[in-house]
Amino acid sequence: MQADVIFRNADIVDGTGQTRIHGDVAIRDDRIVAVGELSKWHGGRDVDCTGLTLAPGFIDPHVHHDEALLTDPGMDCMLSQGVTTIIAGNCGFSIAPLTATIDILPQPLGMILTSTRPRFARFADYRNQLRQSPAAVNSACLIGHGTLRINEVADLGRPADAAELKAMEKSLDQALGEGGIGVSTGLFYPPARAATTAEAIAMARIARAHGKLYVTHMRDEGDQGIEALEETLEIGREACCGVHVSHHKCAGLANHGQSEITLPMFSKAMLDQDVSLDTTPWTASSTMLNSGRHRQATRVIVAESLAYPKMAGRDLADIAREWNTDLDTAMERLLPATGIFFIMDESDVRRILSFEHTIICSDGIARGDHSHPRVWGTFPRVLGHYVRDIGLFTLEEGVKRMTSMPADRFGLKDRGRIREGGYADLVLFDPATIESGATYEKPKTPAHGIKNVWVNGRESWADGANKGNRAGVVLDRDPS
């Protein structure tokens, strides 16, 4: 039998959570055509995998690379850590459909969409552009409720009125029909903070009509986190819609240990409704600079400041001392800005990671030189630190949480598993050396231990370098 490429003598972790096997994998065109003992097969190229692990390409279900897919299509930050598929449009903010004519976009949309290129008034226009100018990774996109509010609601400081809500519903219905894989909300952020629970339910009902998900950055992840989770579950129940909670965390010193309450809430809800969650493997979060958040953190690093670009990478406390002022005043001067907030407790991070239903995500945004290390290092951090060094769960379980689990949850057909007939999205890595190279001091450092990455049958990353292939495709949600 003939194949384009045969991976030989690999430890195959297939993404299902089952015990690894030793064997070979053959690919032809963009598909896996055989798995097992393939000594009688011949390949145009043989890849010796002795001592290495072959896994499905990792799937990142929560990124903010909506614009970067077009402006930085090589996607080094993703390929270098083994990611072959991403889901954008999270936290209520997608860059399409965007019909608002204002020059300065409300944050955080203004941090996600920064170029002067023409805006995409229809979601179909954005997808068509991605098809015409492919990126190096596969992509799917949620439709942001916050973006719809910016388009339709005259005063973002109040709930939508009946006419505005109807306009948002119509726009969402169209965008989902054009390939959006669900709706996302970011009720935590100013453009959507005034939205009522009923408004969110209305969005979820449109998603349900399309057989798609309601994905949410909840209204609060700190002092009101339990109430916000209750609201999220209510939205799912009332809309009869599947709910996915993004980057679940317990933020703020007063809320450390709260995962002992929230995780049982998830378990109980899962008995009666369709609920899932993802999380990141870090004790620091990253979002817009705001006073409420910095007061809950033990340390804040400025990731980016449009007003003072040279302050990126520095501690907020050091900047305040240099300016001879308090933290609040320093923060106000830096705005608009983003920060890295050391705000979670390691025990909560481990507890949430080890929860059997948790999917892994990065919550990364590819901007600037001082971003959070999660942009480049999330998935190797899980497999290196939490799997190999800490033993939080097995390698097979870790890979499952970043492959088949997100693929199944978001309806990415034939992705996330090494099996005959599946797409040839693959990552070859050394389990003894894999780890994040990114740190808070040097966040744009590629991961260690990633040998090769293949996207749809094409080698896209090898030995620390981008191969220049743009093999990514635009994905839809499979309703089955």
Where do the model's predicted regions map?
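Histidine/acidic residue-rich metal-binding segments in metalloenzymes
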Residues: 125-126, 159-185, 191-334, 340-359
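Divalent metal-coordination and catalytic microenvironments
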Residues: 10, 25, 30, 51, ...
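Divalent-metal coordination cores built from histidine and acidic residues
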Residues: 71-181, 273, 282
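Histidine-rich, glycine-flanked metal-binding segment
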Residues: 1-6, 11-57, 72, 436-439
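His/Asp/Glu-enriched, well-ordered alpha-helical/loop segment
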Residues: 237, 293-329, 333, 344, ...
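Short acidic, glycine/serine/threonine-rich loops at helix termini
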Residues: 96-102, 150-156, 197, 226-230, ...
